[in-house]
Curated annotation (Swiss-Prot):
Gene3D superfamilies associated with the record: 1.10.1740.10, NAD(P)-binding Rossmann-like Domain (3.40.50.720)
Organism expressing this protein natively: Bifidobacterium longum subsp. infantis (strain ATCC 15697 / DSM 20088 / JCM 1222 / NCTC 11817 / S12)
Protein's name in the database: 1-deoxy-D-xylulose 5-phosphate reductoisomerase
Primary enzyme class: oxidoreductase
Name of the encoding gene: dxr
Top-level taxon in the UniProt lineage: Bacteria
Annotated positions binding 1-deoxy-D-xylulose 5-phosphate: 131, 156-157, 181, 204, 217, 222-223, 226
Cofactor(s) this protein requires: Mg(2+); Mn(2+)
Amino acid sequence: MSIASNSTVIILGSTGSIGTQGLDVIARHPERFTVTGLAAGGAHIELLAQQAAQFHVSEVAVFDETKIPALQAALAQAGAQGVRVTGGPDSVIAMAGSGANVVLNGITGSIGLEPSIAALKAGSQLALANKESVVAGGHLLFSAQVRENQINPVDSEHSAIWQSLRSGTHAEVAKLVVTASGGPFRGWKRADMENITPEQALHHPTWNMGPVVTINSSTLMNKGLEVIEASRLFDVPPERIDVTVHPQSIVHSMVEFVDGATICQASPPDMRLPIALGLSAPDRMANVAAACDWTKAATWTFEPLDDEAFPAVQLARHCLAASEKHTAVLNAANEQAVHAFLEHRLPYLGIVDTVKAVLDQMDAELRGNPLFTDVEEMNQLELEARRRADDLINKQ
């Protein structure tokens, strides 16, 4: 679908990494976009108020409704006039489903699924950076579409695949190749990782992201989630999706076709490029990000993934092959384990170990009925996965 020349846009997760960069793209192209609503968790109230004032939005929503009084005061301080303020998850879902031309979902976590579904049902084009919507929600998300091609992937890897797929038909695709920077511990062996601290793991060599995504990138769980997302977004089975480590993060992913040709998307790492395409596709906007400088010598390297040191990708593959419920448990247990690690309650290697232990506990019950009937069933399963993860973490 071609986005209207002056599109109304709602930004979910506006104070996070995706949201702030999305607003930066929009600020550079005011003739193309009008921001009508912003939603955020509530941790950065002053920034949210400043964004509302800068973009003259009509509504702001916070997941944490206890932050409404502080937000109202911050809006007044920022000079934002006539802004409707709402709170709680239902208010964010309602905003997402209000019928904007485009909804950019930059929320982290499976809490982003219901807003994604609401946006699709309302007919909005969904610029999706919330990979958990696909990992945990699967067919619940896709069945909410009211037309074909309603989801524009915003993750850099999936945007790269999406762009590369234009070079052939689905039947001509041999495999997808998802690239990984390798994270801050590339080249480390498992025995070297026992004493890794949150401070070390939060130092990513390439990307500036939120804390949970940064930890996921260091364990390569993020790459495992991306394999799941790629398989479901592009209808390619997991055995035809490879992962290669590319430390320079210039090639963002590739598609290999049946004739032996490999098509890739390459650019210096800058999330504004896939965000901009997610907002404007199929059109491209000028001067969004810097291009590769072909006047300078450069070396791009690719190396195989060390599955022994980083078992998260293989674990994700097993879950993808098993069922949608397995991938939801994978995601929920991982979120709990990452939060525990960030709070110094779980050692680094305990993150993926905890996730695997939860999956082992729940495997038999998950296989009986592999698909969710509704979001409530998914939420209940995630709660159980989180509870079991917490039990294991508390025994550490």
